[in-house]
């Protein structure tokens, strides 16, 4: 395993660890999820170019589009939650309320 792949796997693991540790605030969770998606994007693009899979060349772009949609929805939820509750603590949210 070369150093680029090791660094990307390490970045994904650290972002996953960040999601598990910093889950008190919604903003920090969203930032860690974005780091996970970006490391997956780069890793997928490198694997596809390394194995010369031209049929799967659109997969990293599709992942990037879904990542942008996830970031947009997450930020919209963050604005709505901080406007209604006054903070972005995840523990104060009750998802069963209407």
From Swiss-Prot:
Renumbered to this chain, the signal peptide range is none
Tell me where in or outside the cell this protein is found.
Answer: Mitochondrion inner membrane
What are the alphabetically sorted keywords of the record?
A: Electron transport, Membrane, Mitochondrion, Mitochondrion inner membrane, NAD, Respiratory chain, Translocase, Transmembrane, Transmembrane helix, Transport, Ubiquinone
Which Pfam families does the entry mention?
Oxidored_q2 (PF00420)
InterPro entries per record: NADH_UbQ_OxRdtase_chain4L/K (IPR001133), NUOK/Mnh_C1-like (IPR039428)
State the annotated membrane topology for this chain. Answer: Multi-pass membrane protein
Q: Name one GO biological process term.
A: ATP synthesis coupled electron transport
Disulfide pairings: none
The GO molecular function terms of this record are: NADH dehydrogenase (ubiquinone) activity
Record's GO cellular component terms: mitochondrial inner membrane; respiratory chain complex I
State its Enzyme Commission number(s): 7.1.1.2
The lineage's top-level taxon is Eukaryota
Assembly, per entry:
Core subunit of respiratory chain NADH dehydrogenase (Complex I) which is composed of 45 different subunits.
Give the protein's biological function.
Core subunit of the mitochondrial membrane respiratory chain NADH dehydrogenase (Complex I) which catalyzes electron transfer from NADH through the respiratory chain, using ubiquinone as an electron acceptor. Part of the enzyme membrane arm which is embedded in the lipid bilayer and involved in proton translocation.
Record PANTHER family: NADH-UBIQUINONE OXIDOREDUCTASE CHAIN 4L, NADH-UBIQUINONE OXIDOREDUCTASE SUBUNIT ND4L
Protein family: Belongs to the complex I subunit 4L family.
* Record's protein name: NADH-ubiquinone oxidoreductase chain 4L
> What organism is this sequence from?
Macrotis lagotis (Greater bilby)
Q: Which gene encodes it?
A: MT-ND4L
